[in-house]
């Protein structure tokens, strides 16, 4: 499946079936996480069949149900953008494997992650087999997500991918532009905007093959 089609299919899911992640899917997921950790220097830690993290008032407030599997992304405070970038890379791999996901910032309970000095839990990703496939989020017009100009077709294809990216509270607090053939993106003020910046950068690069600075 083409990457853009995968992005179109993937939506946030908060309610899950009581179905284990095992067999070939679990093996492929574990292998992929290990490769991302090696590439990124982050510490992504998968928890399977662990219901306690989402058995809290905060999780119920966030409308999560039956979440028993999740990925904790651990890194340094200044690695939030990297967490978003590689986390979204993993999210789309989960989608390819037939799993549903949801980025989770605050609406969860205690997580027993392993951390090294200067590391902290940056964000979680809930995953599993959803009771539904989720719904598409509303997006700002592409012209509001990048500085107006006469951009080439590949840039606009990248912006289509960017418009499909999940962001905290669907705020889309970022701005893209191109100068002298180089694509730039910056985070605007907002909750978890640095993580969001990493997510949208991955969407653009994965579809176009062009680096975003």
Residue ranges and their predicted role:
Residues 1-213:
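Acidic, surface-exposed loops and disordered segments
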